[in-house]
Amino acid sequence: MSTGPLLIIWHSRTGTSEQLAQAAHQPAGADSRLLRAEEVEPEDLLAAGGYLFCCPENLASMSGEMKEMFDRCYYPVLGKIEGRPYATVIAAGSDGEGAQRQIDRIATGWRLKRVTDRWIVNTEAQEAEAILAPKTVEPEALDRARDLGTALAEGIAQGIF
């Protein structure tokens, strides 16, 4: 059983991942913490009962800031967070599978337990101007993010995971 709040770790360049992370955090309230990837320290991961990783896919890979967080924190928490639940939200202009695979491989190394289906939010941005432009997330996706945050936080708090 996990203890501690849901830790929502995010990075965003154009707003999609940030909006989704904030939406997931909003209903979870005191049962969650929202931290930008650059702010996360190993102690934050150790204190959390589970994780929601929200980031964009950039050039078929997770964003550099999210990768840097994993690089900084991987070994200090290795062997100390096994079995904790996690979920992901990937923002992508097309498929998002590269970023998803990278995070899943890291989570496997940490022996985390995926507790939701993979979720990739496709912005369909294909041209440079559209890719770089600020994004507004559709209300349906924000609702789904709120539901995800609520379910994860409640599952952790109730010892379901």
Language model regions located:
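A short, well-structured beta->alpha microelement
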Residues: 30-40
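Glycine-rich phosphate/pyrophosphate-binding loop and the adjoining helix
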Residues: 2, 117-161
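Residues at the starts of beta-strands that form the adenosine-phosphate
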Residues: 5, 31, 85
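N-terminal beta1-alpha1 ligand-phosphate binding loop
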Residues: 2-28
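Hydrophobic residues within alpha-helices
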Residues: 20-28, 103, 148, 152
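Short, flexible coil/linker segments at domain boundaries that flank nucleotide/cofactor-interacting
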Residues: 1-3, 81-82
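Helix-loop-strand module that forms the ligand-binding subsite of alpha/beta enzymes
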Residues: 38-122
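Short helix-loop-beta junction
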Residues: 21-31, 108-113
